[in-house]
């Protein structure tokens, strides 16, 4: 890559600022199955190299995460695409059922939004106007696994709502139920209006280039990024709060790609709205088993006492919001009991911080 000032940078693989664009997670696997043979790529995403990912981006890179277009084909597809027609509010449930079925079959290329939860992307009417959204969904079956994911999608909605109402930037969400299926509609923050785009870089991509920790906690990585000027100091403070809140509500899925940063003019980056925030300790196990307990929270010293106190209040607000709901399944009751005890025990520890 050659910058405007003439400086040249070489990458052995995909540059760090392209890592989030490559097909990944649920949508990425579906994409590989659907388009792998057509593009001469392996049908299994796990077998892809950076060269394979780049080939996919050059062909279908007109609708991926962030604001970049790679190559003339992606640029032409973006410029020639007709204005998107938003899904009407009154037709969402039925339309989302159809889109979920297509996503499950791998029929829609969609965005490269990562994550293992089944999802699709679309453009839809919302109470605030038309928005690009990511829609997570449960399987249309009556079973323990689907029921648990339905509960967790509602919990995610309530967690993000708790953050937003406290003045913390968090993705705006809506829950839509249709028969046995639940949809969680999440507004995208890398899209502006019908065709506008915003740069977004995950903490994982930043870490790969500037830190190299691989698995460290968010607070450790963001402090190093703040010290080197890659992100704003207040972004590191906000990341600390999100990580502490997630710890207190049992979010065991706070890997480095579940936190992102945005910017209109490059470095230093500010923090993106929170997303993927749910008590994932209760997620179904790979073997189909169900968990209803939470490991004791560790009140790490790399987060300030003040931040822990604020996170504790947010966790209690989240718990109160959950307890007011009557639509969680009965089998989620033991989880709610464990969550209550977990937050109460952590609050006792936090109170000792002074």
Which residues are covered by each model-predicted region?
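Phosphate/dinucleotide-binding and metal-coordinating scaffold of catalytic cores
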Residues: 1-354
């Amino acid at each position: 890559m050659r910058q405007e000032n003439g400086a040249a940078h070489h990458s052995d693989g995909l540059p760090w600022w392209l890592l989030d664009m490559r097909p990944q997670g649920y949508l990425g696997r579906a994409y590989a199955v659907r388009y792998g043979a057509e593009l001469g790529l392996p049908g299994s995403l796990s077998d892809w190299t950076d060269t394979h990912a780049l080939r996919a981006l050059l062909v279908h890179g007109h609708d991926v995460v962030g604001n970049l277009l790679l190559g003339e084909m992606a640029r032409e597809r973006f410029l020639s695409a007709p204005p998107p027609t938003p899904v009407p509010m009154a037709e969402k449930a039925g339309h989302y059922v159809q889109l979920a079925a297509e996503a499950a079959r791998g029929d829609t290329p969609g965005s490269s939004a990562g994550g293992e939860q089944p999802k699709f992307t679309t453009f839809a009417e919302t109470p605030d106007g038309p928005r690009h959204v990511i829609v997570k969904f449960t399987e249309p079956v009556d079973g323990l696994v689907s029921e648990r994911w339905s509960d967790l999608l509602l919990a995610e909605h309530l967690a993000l709502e708790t953050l937003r109402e406290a003045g913390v930037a968090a993705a705006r969400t809506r829950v839509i139920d249709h028969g046995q299926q639940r949809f969680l509609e999440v507004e995208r923050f890398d899209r502006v209006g019908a065709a506008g785009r915003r740069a977004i870089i995950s903490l994982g991509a930043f870490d790969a280039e500037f830190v190299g920790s691989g698995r460290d906690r968010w607070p450790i990585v963001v402090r190093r990024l703040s010290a080197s000027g890659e992100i704003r100091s207040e972004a590191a403070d906000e990341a600390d709060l999100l990580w502490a809140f997630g710890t207190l509500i049992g979010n065991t899925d706070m890997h480095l790609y579940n936190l992102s940063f945005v910017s209109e003019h490059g470095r230093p980056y500010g923090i993106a709205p929170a997303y993927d925030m749910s008590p994932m300790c209760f997620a179904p196990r790979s073997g189909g088993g169900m968990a209803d307990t939470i490991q004791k929270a560790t009140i790490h010293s790399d987060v300030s006492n003040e931040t822990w106190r604020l996170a504790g209040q947010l966790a209690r607000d989240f718990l109160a919001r959950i307890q007011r709901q009557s639509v969680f399944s009965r089998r989620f009751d033991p989880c709610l009991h464990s969550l209550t005890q977990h937050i109460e025990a952590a609050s006792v520890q936090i109170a000792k911080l002074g």
